[in-house]
Amino acid sequence: MARQVSLEMTRNIGIMAHIDAGKTTTTERILYYTGVSHKIGEVHDGAATMDWMEQEQERGITITSAATTCNWRDHRINIIDTPGHVDFTIEVERSLRVLDGAVAVFCSVGGVEPQSETVWRQADKYRVPRIAFINKMDRVGADFFRGIAMIKDRLKANPVPLQIPIGSEENYKGLVDLIEMKGIVFNDESMGATFDTIEIPADLLEQAQEYREALIEEVSSHDDVLMEKYLGGEEISNAELKAAIRQATLDIKICPVICGSAFKNKGVQHLLDAVLDYMPAPTDIPAIQGVDANTDAPIERHASDSEPFAALGFKIMTDPFVGQLCFFRVYSGVIQSGSYVYNATKGKRERIGRILKMHANKREEIKEVYAGDIAAAVGLKYTTTGDTLCAEDHAVILESIEFPEPVISIAIEPKTKADQEKLGLSLGKLASEDPSFRVKTDEETGQTIISGMGELHLEIIVDRLFREFKVEANVGKPQVAYRETITKKVKAEGKFVRQSGGRGQFGHVWLEVEPQEAGKGYEFVDAIKGGVVPREYIPAVDKGIKEALDNGVMAGFPVVDIKVTLVDGSYHEVDSSEMAFKIAGSMGFKEGCQKASPIILEPIMSVEVVVPEEYMGDVIGDLNSRRGRIMGMEGRAGAQVVASMVPLAQMFGYSTDLRSATQGRATYSMTFDHYEPVPKSVAEEIVAKVKG
């Protein structure tokens, strides 16, 4: 089967935006116009084709980015729908990694919303060219020009309108195309599928000319040939103008802006045209960088069928019908179904059983995939998100996707004994789909602890356990791992004597217990002189102390950073035993800890908040109220970055509180930094709670 669509006629794009800007609806309309779905799915009635997990249809938000293929004007467009919620930024991050261009959807009423800032920063990081689509032009309060001003001010981008609207709110009829200088009016009867080209309405003519002039001026400032023509007063043809807009967009010098109302089916066809005209083909983007899997030498892979096969797995999904699917983007070469590939990241050979082209939730089986395309493979056993698949004789590791560390943990336990085994398996499956979700067993409590990117993230995981795997689970409150240590050097005695007829028990030790610097751990020193404690019993003393370390004297937390020296003791010829000295060691250690002013230590997190100027005071006040210490502030791209140290115990519920305090415009990252002593009043509370 030869290649059906040339590389130059392929587009891999993402649709990104704030929660309610109308992303999924826009994607739905694109699928409708490109002839893929015959009935338009409305998000409002929970039937959108892109939102195919049950939770998404209920909540009306998009969680998983389904990759969909459609055709327009003989081109092939692969669309990745991405979620707009802070807790799912991992999904956005992983989809931006594999697409070439993006359509940023903005609501004409809300303009640039908080999440748009986060997503925009992520797109800047991966240098993704963008087109802005100002949606919902028919809503009350719609303002196209304010939307453009906000893109400039808040996102520090360079928006260049290619259209201006004809009317707005309920009078929104169509648009003026500034390149062709024609008016376009949509027919309501045909659901906007047909439109008439008209002369520009007289009242808009002057404004249209101004904007066209501004468009030519901006574009020619990035193109020397056009600049000469423009300054020389020569006519610039539409084809030249389009080519220059395309180049400036690919270089991320400008962001073309168009308008419409996806829900009312207006402007979607022009959005598709703009994607073909101004978004990059796989051949327009730089070759992908990687390293040779054997020698670590840098390698490039160009978008070409003749180069060795290389692809990046960017999403694992469990499909109810075919099992585990791995979505992958082919950067170079060709792969057939049934063939073997090499997973260079894991060093394993894999067989691709079947290859599917996904359309939202319908699937078409294909025999092979070419460079520049996106498809899903069935049958990969070891591959997880971010792994490189390649030809075994040309093994390469492509730059992987960076995943943030989870910031919130809760204990989870099955409701019934029968669910116990299923819980482990199901959590394992979910963790392979989502690298920002981790599962571990707490050695101290034996509980299963799950960690993720936020409270909503974990809520949805627990929800999926029930829906997809039929496992019912109870979740606990978020937990903090406290520790204990001592603050002064003391000498303590441990004596274990039992005489009650027959053979007794006798063990007696003197210990010096002292604090060590943080991170040193436990150290045992044998300083016995003259055999007052026989050689063979000394390891038993050490063992007894080690066992006592697990349960501190204040609240039963593990004891850390402590040095114990065995200085003296005595023994009994008949009654002494290893057992007796082990108990004596443990008793002496506990006695010593009681006397050595013990304290509780808590984990301190390094918290960085990126916040717009106007919310700065609120954010700092809130961090202070959480016992936080502000370490510094700096300006960064129109926002302030506040660095602080905050106890983990005070950070629960923070993502929700921060979101409401800043209308979701602030983002934060949190990593473990060190342990430090808990203030006395807090320590008393912790002890009271444990002893409860």
From Swiss-Prot:
Q: Which organism is it from?
A: Citrifermentans bemidjiense (strain ATCC BAA-1014 / DSM 16622 / JCM 12645 / Bem)
Where is it mainly found?
Answer: cytoplasm
- Subcellular localization, as worded in the UniProt entry: Cytoplasm
Keyword hit for GTP-binding = yes
Protein's recorded name: Elongation factor G
Q: Which GO terms describe its cellular component?
A: cytoplasm
> Looking at the keywords, is Protein biosynthesis present?
yes
InterPro entries for the chain: EFG_II, EFG_III, EFG_III/V, EFG_IV, EFG_V, EFG_V-like, EFTu-like_2, G_TR_CS
Q: What is the lineage of its organism?
A: Bacteria, Pseudomonadati, Thermodesulfobacteriota, Desulfuromonadia, Geobacterales
Record key words, sorted: Cytoplasm, Elongation factor, GTP-binding, Nucleotide-binding, Protein biosynthesis
Please provide the Gene Ontology terms (biological process) for this protein: ribosome disassembly
Supply the Pfam families for this chain.
EFG_C (PF00679), EFG_III (PF14492), EFG_IV (PF03764), GTP_EFTU (PF00009), GTP_EFTU_D2 (PF03144)
Q: Name one GO molecular function term.
A: GTPase activity
- TM spans, by residue? none
Which family does the entry's similarity section mention? Belongs to the TRAFAC class translation factor GTPase superfamily. Classic translation factor GTPase family. EF-G/EF-2 subfamily.
Give the tr-type G domain ranges: 8-283
